[in-house]
Amino acid sequence: MLDVNFFDELRIGLATADDIRNWSYGEVKKPETINYRTLKPEKDGLFCEKIFGPTRDWECYCGKYKRVRFKGIICERCGVEVTRAKVRRERMGHIELAAPVTHIWYFKGVPSRLGYLLDLAPKDLEKIIYFAAYVITSVDDEMRHNELSTLEAEMAVEKKAVEDQRDADLEARAQKLEADLAELEAEGAKSDVRRKVRDSGEREMRQLRDRAQRELDRLDEIWNTFTKLAPKQLIVDEVLYRELQDRYGEYFTGAMGAESIKKLIENFDIDAEAESLREVIRSGKGQKKLRALKRLKVVAAFQQSGNSPMGMVLDAVPVIPPELRPMVQLDGGRFATSDLNDLYRRVINRNNRLKRLIDLGAPEIIVNNEKRMLQESVDALFDNGRRGRPVTGPGNRPLKSLSDLLKGKQGRFRQNLLGKRVDYSGRSVIVVGPQLKLHQCGLPKLMALELFKPFVMKRLVDLNHAQNIKSAKRMVERQRPQVWDVLEEVIAEHPVLLNRAPTLHRLGIQAFEPQLVEGKAIQLHPLVCEAFNADFDGDQMAVHLPLSAEAQAEARILMLSSNNILSPASGKPLAMPRLDMVTGLYYLTTLVEGATGEYQAATKDAPEQGVYSSPAEAIMAMDRGALSVRAKIKVRLTELRPPTDLEAQLFENGWKPGDAWTAETTLGRVMFNELLPKSYPFVNEQMHKKVQARIINDLAERFPMIVVAQTVDKLKDAGFYWATRSGVTVSMADVLVPPQKQEILERHEAEADAIERKYQRGALNHTERNESLVKIWQDATEEVGKALEEFYPADNPIITIVKSGATGNLTQTRTLAGMKGLVTNPKGEFIPRPIKSSFREGLTVLEYFINTHGARKGLADTALRTADSGYLTRRLVDVSQDVIVREHDCETERGINVTLAERGPDGTLIRDAHVETSAFARTLATDAVDANGNVIIERGHDLGDPAIDALLAAGITTVKVRSVLTCTSATGVCAMCYGRSMATGKLVDIGEAVGIVAAQSIGEPGTQLTMRTFHQGGVTGGADIVGGLPRVQELFEARVPRNKAPIADVAGRVRLEESDKFFKITIVPDDGGEEVVYDKLSKRQRLRVITHEDGTEGVLSDGDHVEVGDQLMEGAADPHEVLRVQGPREVQIHLVKEVQEVYRAQGVSIHDKHIEVIVRQMLRRVTIIDSGSTEFLPGSLTERAEFEAENRRVVAEGGEPAAGRPVLMGITKASLATDSWLSAASFQETTRVLTDAAINCRSDKLNGLKENVIIGKLIPAGTGISRYRNIQVQPTEEARAAAYTIPSYEDQYYSPDFGQATGAAVPLDDYGYSDYR
């Protein structure tokens, strides 16, 4: 077998008949499969052992040779080679066809490659191939020209003969008529008898004339056809063709079927054709030029690749190895077989019949029919259903052809090459493990034993518990007591990977150190649930075991859960306390007035109360019951750092551990602060979720990950402990209905009645009534909500849960205890009848019914959203999978400008709300200079929070930062342009697959995005705004938006004219150029609100001034227009901004750089307008880097560079346009991609990730890139002594090449444990 690590590219091309014969080990001559009595393959059949190899290892068909010692011998009796049976997976056969057939991919695909090559319309091509028309393959012009006059004279003679014959016949008939009439007259017949005779005579003469004329016309047609006869001409009339063949057979050749196509291709001069097409393109116009361009693409492909177009017509058909189209016996003695065998059988049957007919010398019409059937059967084998009705099997099911095996989710690419199954894995239900540390998981004993079986067996032998591997295996299977001790030892510090489907981002797989637990459920740390999106309502997770030392090291260093606290999308911590933990910490840090033992100032009667010399003393008081955790106290602290402002007052040289200070706080807050790192300033406030998030963010920014991990673990423990102690529970009694509710409802009911009366009187129309009612009831709902909030006591558990940020919100509380309010109908409009009841009181039947609309739509939406969002992620991954950090710095000077703050009216700086996702974690492209010219931060510095604060303090509002949009790396991007990795908080590593991270970061929140298209605030007739997921798809697919808004092509003054339904906008340019007119703009779309020159805002009106690229109407701008008018940089900014708007509306934080990575891929290509002296074809798409390199080369040689314009491609198109044919074929439209790749003889350089996964190489990202792969690990003596590996008794296991990823894999299938006796 070929080792995948030793080749660098993979090429696909057209196979000629000779290639097919070279691959083959013999010809399949019979349609038989296996003998149903002996169950052995039939000789020369589809499973023949002589062709494909033996069915049993080292055993020939007749049984003469058995055993491995005869290896390589070919049996003289049955002709079978003695070898392994697995050669039946790789040996191919072939079928020699009695007549050539065309390959359906090249004839039927769109566009038809054969048609373009031969310049034949697909319809004509079909007629030729399926024997409905003859085609002229060659004409001997010279001979025809030389003998034309002779032939013409012969034709004239023939015509003369026909005319003479006609005249003679007419003469004779006329004389006979005269004689008959004379005779009748003599007999004295009546006049009507005479008339009848005359009429019949004249009729016969007319027929004679017509017959002669037809003959003359036919001769004319034959002659005209012959004189104009040219190659590739179709002749549908069989009689005409026969005549031509009989008369002028030596001057031309013609045929039908694939043979004629083959002859045409043989006579085809590719170079001459390419030259003439280039000439047409240079001089032609319109349709003619377009057609020539399309044809040139195909012709040039053959010219440049050196492929022979003969490969599109087959003389032999390959037969794939039998193990890939198996036949298996079912229980009932029946057989199940792959559809391919049926399809091959049809081909062989028809082929054999055709051979027989040709040998018998059957009439041409019968032979042609058989040839047509053969062509159809080969078509069905290659791509069933592409032409005509598909061939069906039992139960009218279309048979799966070779193309179907590659296509779609169940095809070879997606099912078997990109989604392989893994050994050393298990799955089970998950339960919570609150006692675990962040980097641990609980692994059921039985599962661990099965997973670590080889390790345990090896260790049992090492420790002399077992004599050999076989007995060790028996011990493990019988679960002897020693096994458990060995298992404990083996799993120590051996991380396992846990994965929960769907794995939407990279945190869906993390490494943990296993702890053995009883039971059969995997225990999961509560803080990693957020990353896995797991809950414990029956979710299952899979466990995988990293085997090699390198895999274990990667799992521990890169994938351990405590190293993955930050989200790769936004850089915010994901391992946050949630639900009960939040409630517990909130309870712990609450301050309650009047609680037991609270601080009281000294009076003349009593000293100070509630003052403690240390936290320990306060805890003693609490244990004694004299102090509540939530009471305000004064306490002297020495081990906790004071808040920053207090520290500046109290300690001039800064606080050191041991310095005492007094805090006015609660014991709970002191306990909370003891959980944080020593040097973290004291936090003296109530901890709701937002504050907790802020603290953990801060910790992640300032402390190493290990400290953060330990801290969140402590917070988790404290959270659970105090949540239990707080006794927060919810019962019916806690759901309190506010007493004002009745009065509020009655008041609004009266208003609604008034509106209803107006409507009845006709003072309001239907729409106005509905809008007024909706407004009234929205106010009522809001008022009930406010009343509810004021009515609830502070210690109510429901309010505590909501206010702490653990879960839920006030709207849900209002629904429970206030009123549900207005609901929508399936169209998304409000139903003007509100739901007045709360869930506590219960709904009436009508209320329940109208509530179900929204509820059911919600469920349906969720299901649709999940599928859509998954598909979006898949397309994003596909388009960005080859964006990998390839170098440290591309040294570009370019960058993009980002805003840090806006100046307010009073001159103060207002920090930009989106700094976190725009400037944060990037690298400065130029020095940041303040108003006086001082350099605040130098170029190349990373922008973290401290740096941004420094810039704002210096009054700098915008900075220029490096971005992937301006990166000049030839492949992938450079680390400096990408900036900081959001997941680690450090500069991104070389080898990081930032493209995939970007796709996951955008795709993972996709499910949260809403499906619906929003109505603009109740304005009827207002255009729908497309929002949510559809909008994101529209942007990434670069589609023209519905209701697109025109943008100003030039800067100038607006002239506005309106008619009944339309606006007409004319822009008079400032530079005095031609006026630009936008006609027929629908009034329904409404004009854009703009800021006028005097600073006021208003609708665009006559005389306003607009800049280039300003939108003129409401709606979304078309990105292609933005590209045309404003250029690539603006369209990049536009797309990033628009995508971010959708995500921000849902409260999802994603860093701009992820969206930029995708947008960069959408703008990578250039359309060639003029090819200059380059090889590019006009109208073709090419990579920008390739375009620039080629232009540089041509200019250096003194040629004319090509002209091109940037083009914006949607992600699906961009994925299919990738250089890698493997990646494109595994994405969509597999057959089309492969057809194209084969004609162009495409070579896949294996740069991206997908290509390498498909052929089984390590991916060129992460530790798979060459700079990491060629590291050699030299273990120390201790490591050598302590390490245990998969059973292997060779001491050279730790030879110097230990750790080389390119070493041969262990063939586990061939391991017989019996060798170790």
UniProtKB/Swiss-Prot annotation:
Zn(2+) 1 binds at C60, C62, C75, C78. One of its GO terms (cellular component) is DNA-directed RNA polymerase complex. This is DNA-directed RNA polymerase subunit beta'. Gene3D superfamilies: 1.10.132.30, 1.10.150.390, 1.10.1790.20, 1.10.40.90, 2.40.40.20, 2.40.50.100, RNA polymerase II, clamp domain, RNA polymerase Rpb1, domain 3. The RNAP catalytic core consists of 2 alpha, 1 beta, 1 beta' and 1 omega subunit. When a sigma factor is associated with the core the holoenzyme is formed, which can initiate transcription. The gene is rpoC. Binds 1 Mg(2+) ion per subunit. Binds 2 Zn(2+) ions per subunit. DNA-dependent RNA polymerase catalyzes the transcription of DNA into RNA using the four ribonucleoside triphosphates as substrates. Mg(2+) binds at D535, D537, D539. Zn(2+) 2 binds at C890, C967, C974, C977. Belongs to the RNA polymerase beta' chain family. It comes from Mycolicibacterium smegmatis (strain ATCC 700084 / mc(2)155). The keyword Cytoplasm does not apply. Pfam families: RNA_pol_Rpb1_1, RNA_pol_Rpb1_2, RNA_pol_Rpb1_3, RNA_pol_Rpb1_4, RNA_pol_Rpb1_5. HAMAP family: RNApol_bact_RpoC. InterPro entries: DNA-dir_RpoC_beta_prime, DNA-dir_RpoC_beta_prime_bact, RNA_pol_asu, RNA_pol_N, RNA_pol_Rpb1_1, RNA_pol_Rpb1_3, RNA_pol_Rpb1_3_sf, RNA_pol_Rpb1_4. Its EC number is 2.7.7.6. One of its GO terms (biological process) is DNA-templated transcription. It catalyses: RNA(n) + a ribonucleoside 5'-triphosphate = RNA(n+1) + diphosphate. Its cofactor is Mg(2+); Zn(2+). The keyword Kinase does not apply. Keywords: DNA-directed RNA polymerase, Magnesium, Metal-binding, Nucleotidyltransferase, Transcription, Transferase, Zinc.
